[in-house]
Amino acid sequence: MALGALKSDSYVELSQYRDQHFRGNRSDQECLLKHSCTLYVGNLSFYTTEEQIHELFSKSGDVKKIVMGLDKIKKTACGFCFVEYYTRTDAEQAMRFINGTRLDDRIIRTDWDAGFKEGRQYGRGKSGGQVRDEYRQDYDAGRGGYGKIVQSI
């Protein structure tokens, strides 16, 4: 990383999370994350639309593409998406100002993503959605009720 990036007011730190399904080594992943224009957006309501995502995230810059996360079995929204900007600066603005804001009565979280690849739009949980929704103990109407494993007991 260039020294200028360390001194830049616009530089947004990487989180500790790393995609365990990333194909490549840790160094490659770090490099992609540091230069990426793509954000992972989590904790969305299952009812949040692509239009709502676009309206919110376009306040930080020009959005190139939005990919909504889908349940791999039902092909319905499952609470996450990827937002790609044309520039890193616009993506950094979103990380700084949109992370932790409320959308559809939910506090959303953003994180850097190494770049969208086909197939990543599908939930990785056994029941088709996100893994975190399988183990949820509390009732969450915005994310399908109780966790899938709790429902099956």
From Swiss-Prot:
Q: Its GO CC terms? A: cytoplasm; nuclear cap binding complex; nucleus
- The cysteines joined by S-S bonds are none
- Where is mRNA annotated to bind? Y17, Y40, R109, T110, D111, W112, D113, R120, Q121, Y122, G123, R124, Q130, V131
Q: Which UniProt keywords apply?
A: Cytoplasm, mRNA processing, mRNA splicing, mRNA transport, Nonsense-mediated mRNA decay, Nucleus, RNA-binding, RNA-mediated gene silencing, Translation regulation, Transport
| Gene Ontology molecular-function annotations | mRNA binding; RNA 7-methylguanosine cap binding; snRNA binding
The residue ranges of the RRM domain are 37-115
Q: Name one Pfam family in it.
A: RRM_1
- The signal peptide stretch is none
Broad class of where this protein is predominantly found: nucleus
Q: What SUPFAM superfamilies does its record include?
A: RNA-binding domain, RBD
Question: Where are its TM segments located?
Answer: none
SMART domains attached to this UniProt entry:
RRM (SM00360)
Name its cellular compartments: Nucleus; Cytoplasm
- PROSITE patterns of this UniProt entry? RRM
Origin: domain of life: Eukaryota
The record, for InterPro entries, names: NCBP2, NCBP2_RRM, Nucleotide-bd_a/b_plait_sf, RBD_domain_sf, RRM_dom
One GO term under biological process is: RNA splicing
This molecule's function is given as:
Component of the cap-binding complex (CBC), which binds co-transcriptionally to the 5' cap of pre-mRNAs and is involved in various processes such as pre-mRNA splicing, translation regulation, nonsense-mediated mRNA decay, RNA-mediated gene silencing (RNAi) by microRNAs (miRNAs) and mRNA export. The CBC complex is involved in mRNA export from the nucleus, leading to the recruitment of the mRNA export machinery to the 5' end of mRNA and to mRNA export in a 5' to 3' direction through the nuclear pore.
Subunit record text: Component of the nuclear cap-binding complex (CBC), a heterodimer composed of ncbp1/cbp80 and ncbp2/cbp20 that interacts with m7GpppG-capped RNA.
- Which PANTHER family does its entry note? 20 KD NUCLEAR CAP BINDING PROTEIN, NUCLEAR CAP-BINDING PROTEIN SUBUNIT 2
User: Belongs to which family?
Assistant: Belongs to the RRM NCBP2 family.
Entry protein name: Nuclear cap-binding protein subunit 2
Species of the source: Xenopus tropicalis (Western clawed frog)
